[in-house]
């Protein structure tokens, strides 16, 4: 039985790969793709979502742009990681279709309302759109099965010593989401830094020799550049956002623990920190399933096998 999902993203190399991974599997039914600012400015992330869906010949999936800035803070982007376009590296097609006239929140609300099954939200950028949806449509909470997000860390951050980028960009939005009572799966840096793609994995992808695999290999070639900085201690590049889709497809690839997670919204030193109570020290009930480990080889094999699906016949089936 296929699971209806809405992908809320800020493409971004790893967002694009998460989207490509999701659309290779009939077990997931994408009802919509929505975008926010984050890895690049809102106009660029929206355009990037349209370009990736054009590459995949999926103009049937409605796309809408969302929040242009965080709830109460100034916009921050990660152009040092993702380049001038947000998807530097491959030559992507121009969009073949237009975004919806409604904004991201209203498109999500419409699709959740219309769905005959509870919908899973998959945010892989800042949580602004999701927070706005939850705040403005309380009547739809019961129709959201789960929020599977990329963000946070139980350990150290990657944007500040304490905070991961997506949560740091809009901690107030993250606070709303984690306090919502909706089941959450948190794919934080603890697991995504283990989900590294290596040079030899990129060559496996390139050898698939279809247009989508070629695009992903070229995305990863560029993505590797930032992560080769010795300060990170990486051998490869961490594929953060695809962990959300991989968990939906095969949760057995991951080690997980139910924890209480709180968001720091005030501290000068630890703003945006996800405080993960792994040892039940606070006595507060768990509000998230937090991923801590991954079968890296199984994850890479899933990605490679998924990219092999994108034959010309598959791409032209609609």
From Swiss-Prot:
PROSITE patterns: IUNH. GO terms for molecular function: purine nucleosidase activity; uridine nucleosidase activity. Keywords: Glycosidase, Hydrolase. It comes from the Bacteria. The active site is at 240. It is an enzyme of class 3 (hydrolase). GO terms for cellular component: cytosol. The keyword Protease does not apply. Its EC number is 3.2.-.-. Belongs to the IUNH family. RihA subfamily. Pfam families: IU_nuc_hydro. The keyword Hydrolase applies. Transmembrane segments: none annotated. Coiled coil: none annotated. This is Pyrimidine-specific ribonucleoside hydrolase RihA. The gene is rihA. HAMAP family: Pyrim_hydro_RihA. It comes from Shewanella sp. (strain ANA-3).
């Amino acid at each position: 039985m296929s699971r209806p999902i809405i992908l809320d993203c800020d493409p971004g190399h790893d967002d694009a790969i998460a989207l490509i991974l999701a659309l290779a599997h009939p077990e997931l039914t994408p009802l919509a793709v929505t975008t926010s600012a984050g890895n690049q400015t809102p106009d660029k992330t929206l355009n990037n979502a349209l370009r990736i869906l054009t590459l995949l010949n999926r103009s049937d999936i409605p796309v809408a742009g969302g929040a242009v800035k965080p709830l109460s803070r100034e916009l921050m982007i990660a152009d040092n990681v993702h380049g001038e376009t947000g998807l530097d590296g491959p030559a992507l097609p121009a969009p073949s279709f237009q975004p919806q006239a409604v904004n991201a929140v209203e498109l999500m609300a419409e699709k959740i309302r219309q769905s005959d099954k509870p919908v899973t939200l998959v945010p892989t950028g800042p949580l602004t759109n999701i927070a706005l949806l939850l705040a403005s449509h309380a009547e739809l909470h019961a129709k959201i099965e789960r929020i599977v997000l990329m963000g946070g860390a139980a350990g150290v951050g990657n944007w500040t010593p304490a905070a991961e980028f997506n949560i740091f960009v809009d901690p107030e939005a993250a606070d709303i989401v984690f306090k919502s009572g909706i089941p959450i799966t948190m794919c934080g840096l603890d697991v995504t830094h283990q989900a590294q793609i290596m040079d030899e994995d990129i060559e496996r992808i390139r050898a698939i020799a279809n247009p989508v695999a070629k695009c992903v290999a070229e995305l990863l070639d560029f993505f590797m550049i930032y992560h080769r900085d010795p300060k990170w201690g990486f051998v490869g590049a961490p594929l953060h956002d695809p962990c959300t889709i991989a968990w939906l497809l095969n949760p057995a690839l991951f080690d997980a623990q139910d924890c209480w997670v709180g968001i720091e919204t005030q501290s000068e030193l630890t703003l945006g920190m996800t405080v993960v109570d792994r040892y039940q020290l606070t006595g507060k009930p768990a509000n998230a399933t937090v991923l801590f480990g991954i079968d890296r080889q199984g994850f890479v094999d899933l990605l490679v096998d998924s990219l092999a699906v994108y034959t010309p016949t598959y791409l032209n089936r609609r």
